[in-house]
Amino acid sequence: MKDTKLVKLTGTSADKNVLEEAGRLIRQGELVIFPTETVYGIGANGLDAVACRAIYTAKGRPSDNPLILTVPDKAGVEAVVSYLPPLAETLIEKFWPGPLTLVLPRKDTVPDAATGGLDTVALRCPDHAGCREFLKAAGVPIAGPSAAAEAFHDMEGRVAMILDGGSCTVGVESTIVEVLDNVVTVLRPGAVTEEMLAEVAPYVTTDTHLVTGKGVPKAPGMKYRHYAPEAPVRVFVGSADQVSKAVGEVRTAAENDGKRLGYLLSREVIEKSEVTGKDVYCWGTHGNKTELAKELYRGLLFFDEHPVDLIVAEGVETGGIGTAVMNRMKKAADGDVTTV
């Protein structure tokens, strides 16, 4: 067990010494949890195979699931890719710093442990000033798969330091795209939508298949679920009236079976369904995709702390960031999503 140092960032010059210490720990092969605008990351030196493997151990992550390397700027990309397509440069200029990850051909200096053995590497520059200062202090690309801020206590003893930067502004992981010639393929939806990508890319397509068996995914989220609570999840999408009716039907059946339900719902559906008590988590206003994106993982993890037999959740329509939200909800629910 490690002695984990927890530090709250202030967003001021007072953070400088802490960020330099965190960067030094990364260079020494240690793990550091750090904030971004999307979700928190479990960071390690992305050029150190041993450190990257330590991430898999700490998180219990399959080693064939590629890691995303975070860099402070475009120069950080050029240091680890063998070729930077012109279209990728355009995407960097348009969307960085921001929630867009690019999958590009890698140099041999990037270890297989960071790429799942693929000949490509996933790269991102976060839109978070403290994070970028941390990256500069480290002086190396930082491999940083997602970590839930609400589950910091689970990582104590596994990492050297936790940089607590408060709530993330986006709430779901970055969009991941592969760039080949003039084609951008979305491997994982996120806050940078297909519509936004189409404004600068000649052709945009989506790879929706899930990798199974011994296949190696090109990006995180293509083979394994992101966050999922211990309890099964059932998701309903529709008007507040329709969802509240569906919630009522599930509640009646659960009461007859003696099951305890958890409710992850909008304010309007909670009121219409008349559900109360400690097993209710309100994620925001009905239909507000941005609010659900920010609260989704916090809400799912809430029910690990308040165990239930089944979580009844309310989703949103796809489109915009709603596509990313429903991608995560569908995986958390193992596909149990119903439009009512």
For the regions a protein language model found, what residue spans apply to each?
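Active-site-adjacent structural elements in enzyme catalytic cores
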Residues: 1-340
